[in-house]
Every structure is written in C-alpha cells, then in structure tokens.
Amino acid sequence: MRLALWTLALVAIAGTPLRAQQVTLGAGYALADYREQADFLHFTGSGPTAMVSVERGRLALRVDAWHLGLDPENNAAPALEPFTLDQLNVRLGVRAMSVVGIEAGYMKRWVDPSRAAQSFSAATLGVRAAYPLAPGAEVAVRTAYVAGTDFTGGGSAPFGIELGLSAYGPGSGRFRVTGDYEFQRIDRRTYQTGGRLSVPIQSSLARVGLTVRF
C-alpha cells in the first residue's frame, strides 16, 4: 500500500508541466540481501520497484521507491521472523562537468513489524558519473556518504556509505532496459551496560527494469 501511494505521487510529480524538461518513469523488480551484526541477522527477499526522474538543464531530481518481502536465511539466528521493507530515496543532482554530478539526498526506510529490523532516515551527499557507451546506452557509478542517521531503535552512526552501479541499454524509441546494483553499509553503534556495542547494518539490492522517457 505504501509503495502504491508513493508511485501515484511520483506520477503526479512527473505530470507537472515544465518547459524543456525530460521526465523518465520506470518500474522493475529487485532481489535484496539484508544483514545486521554480520550474519547474525541475515535476510533475503525480493519485491517491486518504481522510479521517476525529472531533468532540466544541469539539474536532475530522482525519486526511487521499493517494497520488499524479506525472510531469514538458514544461517541466521533462530527465532527470526520475516518482515516487509519499504524504502524511499530522493536525490537532487547538479551536473558539475560533462559526465560528473554532485548529489544531495534523503532516504527513509520503514520496516513492518518494527521489532524485526531497524527503520531509519538519513541524509546523503555524494557524486555520480555517467559514461556513454553507445547511442542510447550508458553506464553510471555513484558513491555517497550517509549522515544524520536517525534509528527507531536508538543508537548513532558516525559513518555510512552507499555505492551504486547502473547500466542503461539501448531501447526501442522511448523505452530502455535498465539494470543496477546498490550497496549500503551503516556503522550503527549502541550503548548497553556502560559499553559501546557495534551493530552495523548492511544491505544490497540488484534490480532490472524498464523505463520510458517523455
């Protein structure tokens, strides 16, 4: 339900008239891997994804959303329960050079049931580089620092990083096939009985999809 609402909002944004803009809508399917405390809490799963991007001149706004169903892996701790993960990513980029841009963003993650894993929000700041391979095809790499993380279960994260690799294949007319991989690690820390406990959160997402540009 939450993903459907965000998808409707993305379509509404994309439908707003703006001279000389390029709008891209996309949908896909993703495979995901989620871990807390290394292999102690290990989940895998999959689910649908949606995206919209609006480009105007040197500016680019991109919004991604996904809804994942995650189940415990066999090597995970006992008594773990499956959960759903909804995530929203918003990134605003400015092209600084022909192929390199600077991006600032915000991300929000919801987990249900909340006791199964951490929900959080955070800000991101990074760079993105896109390299054309052929007419209508390109590859892009992205890295970002994750800051200001606010966890529902408490704790802090002095360091977090995102890495991304995307490929856009030549398509037919306005349509293109896409594939991308995202990796995120957040070094969460909590304090118990007077001592500091390291509980890192690590996730990866591989997805394929189809986009249409207007």
Regions found by a protein language model. Give the residues of each.
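Transmembrane beta-strands of outer-membrane beta-barrel pores
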Residues: 29-35, 56-58, 65-71, 106-112, ...
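Outer-membrane beta-barrel "beta-signal"
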Residues: 165-170, 200-214
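Residues that define the transmembrane beta-barrel architecture of outer-membrane proteins
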Residues: 42-48, 55-57, 82-88, 98, ...
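Transmembrane beta-strands of outer-membrane beta-barrel proteins
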Residues: 23-27, 50, 59-63, 98-104, ...
